[in-house]
C-alpha cells in the first residue's frame, strides 16, 4: 500500500521507482504571477493584435486620421511656467503658425486629434510652510466664436458661488459659445506635517477638435475664426498662489479642404 493516495509503485526490471500520478493540469503547480482581471470588456481587447480581436472591434474601429484630414501627424508643444492665482489664468492651446514644417499648419483648417498635458504644480519655500490645502482646477474649453485680441478672463466666462473656482460653471448667456471639453484638478498641501509641496499632472485626451484660422499666418488668438482651444487654471486658495510647470503637446492633422 502506498502512503499517499496519488502515489503508485511502478516496478521495472532494474529498480523500483515511486512515481506520482498527477491528473491535474501541468500549469496548476507552476508558480505564476498574480493576474489582474479587467472588468472593462473593451479595454481587455485593446492591446491585442488585430487578428485576435473580435469582429466588432475590427470593423467598428476609430480611424487613425480624423475624418476630412490628411497626414502626417504634426506636433506642437507649449512649455511655460505659470503663476496660478485665485482669479484664474488662461492659455491658448491652438496657437499654430502657418508653415511647411511638422509643427506648422498648411492652411486655415486643421484638427487637433489629441492633447497631452504633462508637468507639475508646486509651491515656493514660504507658502509650503503654512498649514493649508490648495486645489488647482483645470478647464479645457472650446471657444466656438473667438473675438478680440486676447481670450476673456476666468471671471468673465465662469459663474462662481462666492468666487470659488471649484464651483465654476459657464455663464448662461455664454453656454452656446464656450463648452467645457475636459475638467480635472490637482492638490497640494502645505504645513509641517503631511506636506505635499508638489503634485504631478499627467493627462491625455482625445478631442478631434477642428480649428479654423483666417488668412493670417501667425498663430495668435486674434487670428482664430472658429473653435479656439483654451486651458483655464485657477487655485481654490484665495491668498496662496501655486506655480504650474507644464508641457502641453497637441497632435493635429491638416484638413483636406485647405
UniProtKB/Swiss-Prot annotation:
Origin: domain of life: Viruses
Record InterPro entries: Gem_coat_AR1, GV_A/BR1_coat, Viral_coat
The entry's keywords: Capsid protein, DNA-binding, Host nucleus, Host-virus interaction, Metal-binding, T=1 icosahedral capsid protein, Viral penetration into host nucleus, Virion, Virus entry into host cell, Zinc, Zinc-finger
Zn finger (unnamed) location: 69-86
Motif (Nuclear export signal): 102-123
Motif range (Nuclear localization signal): 41-55
Subcellular location(s) per record: Virion; Host nucleus
The keyword Ion transport is assigned to this record: no
GO MF: DNA binding; structural molecule activity; zinc ion binding
Motif Bipartite nuclear localization signal, residue numbers: 3-20, 202-249
Job of this protein: Encapsidates the viral DNA into characteristic twinned ('geminate') particles. Binds the genomic viral ssDNA and shuttles it into and out of the cell nucleus. The CP of bipartite geminiviruses is not required for cell-to-cell or systemic movement.
Subunit structure of this chain's protein: Homomultimer. Binds to single-stranded and double-stranded viral DNA. Interacts (via nuclear localization signals) with host importin alpha-1a.
Family of this protein: Belongs to the geminiviridae capsid protein family.
Protein name per its UniProtKB record: Capsid protein
The organism of origin for this protein: African cassava mosaic virus (isolate Nigerian)
Amino acid at each position: 500500500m502506498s502512503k499517499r493516495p496519488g502515489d503508485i509503485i511502478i516496478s521495472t526490471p532494474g529498480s523500483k521507482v515511486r512515481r506520482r500520478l498527477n491528473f491535474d493540469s501541468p500549469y496548476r503547480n507552476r508558480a505564476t504571477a498574480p493576474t489582474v482581471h479587467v472588468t472593462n470588456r473593451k479595454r481587455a481587447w485593446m492591446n491585442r493584435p488585430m487578428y485576435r480581436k473580435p469582429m466588432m472591434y475590427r470593423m467598428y474601429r476609430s480611424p487613425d486620421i480624423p475624418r476630412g484630414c490628411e497626414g502626417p501627424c504634426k506636433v506642437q508643444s507649449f512649455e511655460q511656467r505659470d503663476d496660478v492665482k485665485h482669479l484664474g489664468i488662461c492659455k491658448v492651446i491652438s496657437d499654430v503658425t502657418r508653415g511647411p514644417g511638422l509643427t506648422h499648419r498648411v492652411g486655415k483648417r486643421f484638427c487637433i486629434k489629441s492633447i497631452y498635458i504633462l508637468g507639475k504644480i508646486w509651491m515656493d519655500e514660504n507658502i509650503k510652510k503654512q498649514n493649508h490645502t490648495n486645489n488647482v482646477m483645470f478647464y479645457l474649453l472650446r471657444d466656438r466664436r473667438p473675438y478680440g485680441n486676447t481670450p476673456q478672463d476666468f471671471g468673465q466666462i465662469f459663474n462662481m458661488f462666492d468666487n470659488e473656482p471649484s464651483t465654476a460653471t459657464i455663464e448662461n448667456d455664454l453656454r452656446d459659445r464656450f463648452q467645457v471639453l475636459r475638467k480635472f484638478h490637482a492638490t497640494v498641501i502645505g504645513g509641517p506635517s503631511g506636506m505635499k509641496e508638489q503634485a504631478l499632472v499627467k493627462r491625455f485626451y482625445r478631442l478631434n477638435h477642428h480649428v479654423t484660422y483666417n488668412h493670417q499666418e501667425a498663430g495668435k488668438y486674434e487670428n482664430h475664426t472658429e473653435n479656439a482651444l483654451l486651458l483655464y487654471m485657477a487655485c481654490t486658495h484665495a491668498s496662496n498662489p501655486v506655480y504650474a510647470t507644464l508641457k502641453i503637446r497637441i497632435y493635429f492633422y491638416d484638413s483636406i479642404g485647405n
